[in-house]
Amino acid sequence: METRTASEPTPMKNRTTSERKSPRELVVSRTINGPARIVFEAWTKPELFKQWWVPKSFGLTLLSCDMDVRPGGKYKLVFKHGASEPMAFYGRYTEVTPPARLVWTNEEGGEDGSVTTVTFKEEGGKTLVVLTELYPSKEALDAAIASSSTSGDMNETFEQLDALVVTLK
């Protein structure tokens, strides 16, 4: 059942791995060159999040990034691509444990959206970030993988996070 992909490491970058752990679960991980406190801030402060979340190769503009990072708090990200209509992604934070763990719902697909869990484990001044995406069905994960909105995109996204964190130390 396991499907693994990995980006190749370069001198300044770490490897991003993606693994399908079950029919509904995708896990993406990467060691980021910075302490957990700073990496966590990059995930929870809109002014930092906007700098790395959207893969540059997509040509998307992040028009707005509203984040109320607390249990029960909501988030909403609005993207635009060229002349197309803006698209929104939104949900609710269900768990916030600085600087170790974030859990949120993805509600733009209705009640049966995916749930994202991100853990941050610091070791030696670097932080292992593990993002787990639990989809409502095998078909939903299959569709996400087919649209390349998961593992491939996360390689570039995590590279951008790594590059930003190095500047924040």
Positions of PLM-derived features:
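Hydrophobic/aromatic beta-strand elements that line small-molecule binding cavities or substrate pockets
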Residues: 30, 64-67, 89-95, 106, ...
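A short, structured loop/turn motif at beta-sheet edges
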Residues: 36-37, 68-70, 94-100, 119-128
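Hydrophobic pocket/interface hotspot
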Residues: 39, 49, 75-77, 93, ...
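Short coil-to-beta-strand transition motifs
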Residues: 84-89, 111-113
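Beta-strand/loop substructures that line and gate deep hydrophobic ligand-binding cavities in soluble
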Residues: 103-156
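Generic C-terminal helix-cap and adjacent flexible tail
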Residues: 163-169
